[in-house]
UniProtKB/Swiss-Prot annotation:
Entry-linked NCBIfam families: hutU, PRK05414.1
Catalytic activity entry: 4-imidazolone-5-propanoate = trans-urocanate + H2O
Organism: Shewanella woodyi (strain ATCC 51908 / MS32)
Gene, per the UniProt record: hutU
InterPro entries noted in UniProt: Urocanase, Urocanase-like, Urocanase_C, Urocanase_central_sf, Urocanase_CS, Urocanase_N, Urocanase_Rossmann-like, Urocanase_sf
Residues forming the catalytic site: C410
Identification of the protein by name: Urocanate hydratase
Keyword tRNA processing: no
Amino acid sequence: MDKRHNPSRRIIAPHGSKLSCKSWTTEAPMRMLMNNLHPDVAERPEDLVVYGGIGRAARDWECYDKIIEVLQRLEEDETLLVQSGKPVGVFKTHNNAPRVIIANSNLVPHWANWEHFNELDKKGLAMYGQMTAGSWIYIGSQGIVQGTYETFVAMAKQHFGGSSAGKWILTGGLGGMGGAQPLAGTMAGYSVLTCEVDETRIDFRLRTRYVDKKATSLDEALAMIDEANKSGKPVSVGLLANAADVFAELVERGITPDVVTDQTSAHDPLNGYLPQGWSLEQAADMRKKDEAAVVKAAKQSMAVQVKAMLALQAAGAATTDYGNNIRQMAFEEGVENAFDFPGFVPAYVRPLFCEGIGPFRWAALSGDPEDIYKTDAKVKELIPDNPHLHNWLDMARERIAFQGLPSRICWVGLKDRARLALAFNEMVKNGELSAPVVIGRDHLDSGSVASPNRETESMLDGSDAVSDWPLMNALLNTASGATWVSLHHGGGVGMGFSQHSGVVIVADGTDDAAARLGRVLWNDPATGVMRHADAGYDIAKNCAKEQGLDLPMLEK
């Protein structure tokens, strides 16, 4: 019997201002862990899977229950240690220390591969935490919508003279991450055709308003895209089909999308990518019988898809890897030029990272959407001269359905994160907000990740694989007083290809919280500016000087 599977469990985080733990600094991680497993948030909550193939919130249900139990008794001067989803110790620390420290999926580099991890996983000795699954700050697909939106806007500026009108995107994957693409694309003015092999995922995205329409044939989907482009009203279509099949067929037909990318769970060939010609049931059965055969077949299909992406690029499509390591998988399968199209970070996002700009997010522990709308207004008030940001907040309110606890994401940088956090804390203190908020981010941020095929691809100084930076980020956030800190391996791109850290902090209206917020929300993005300045980026060097960062080796 799999201790991770229990279809009878239905987890909903408490709402309101009544505590079930001893303080908000322990109530917050409890509610956010539970929120990760909300049926409208998680991909397979009955299996503790939040998103990204097998990205889990806890190792098994026994561990989940014990984590909740410990958080409810944890004192304000104690720290819970969670090792790959298992609560392993409680230690006396102090009230400015994190209440929870998490380490997920970390392996000694020589053994940092899927084969070794899967053996440990089968024995119940490890858990894949992805990025925000095992660090308890996943907020549904909204968590990646703005980053995807910013990328698509940047692509329009770079390739289409700033206008996406009449343009369409071809992509794959409607899971927890990929599900953001159709909404982000239409918000940026494109029509979007997304291939997905699991019909329940298409239906989930329809229900949560991330996808507009469903199609069961390529002809039907293309007709929907064509009609939308003629009418000038962008549409997103979820096509029930294998991405490798569709991408290759478009090449054969001579049909070239304007933008091509992919966000299937290609990072995990065993659990995350359905081989061509296979049914979901067949794949599930084969995983029990012959894992190596599944991996081989999946990677062969990825090779087909990447070859098609290269052909579409040659035909004129703006083509980018959206961070799922599909190029690496195809390269290992013999596609020698798999890396001829760039990753999205070096191509479109890195200038933002140089200024510490990244996916700042917060959630209302009250469960009241009004608390988010009030914080939206506060962001506009404090950052009045950023129409692009204001437009994002307006679109987010209008078009993004909350999943679980109401939350918001907006990309802001070093000079703004601490200001916003302190303002939110003041709103809790004076009663404008009905309960505290938690503030966190994705691990995909400027100073918190080493991932040579994604966030740190093609660094100016060649330091792509240096992972000291996320380790220092986690240690500094711990020293600065974050409420919980996490250090993971393998998120986004799979085992052996990334190390990254997460941070979450509670704004509970107290003066102690204000001091912690000021430190954490300055230091955390500052490490991103530091990392990019150290790599030689002029934007980061200038930002460091403007913001007065003390970087001893930076020329004054």
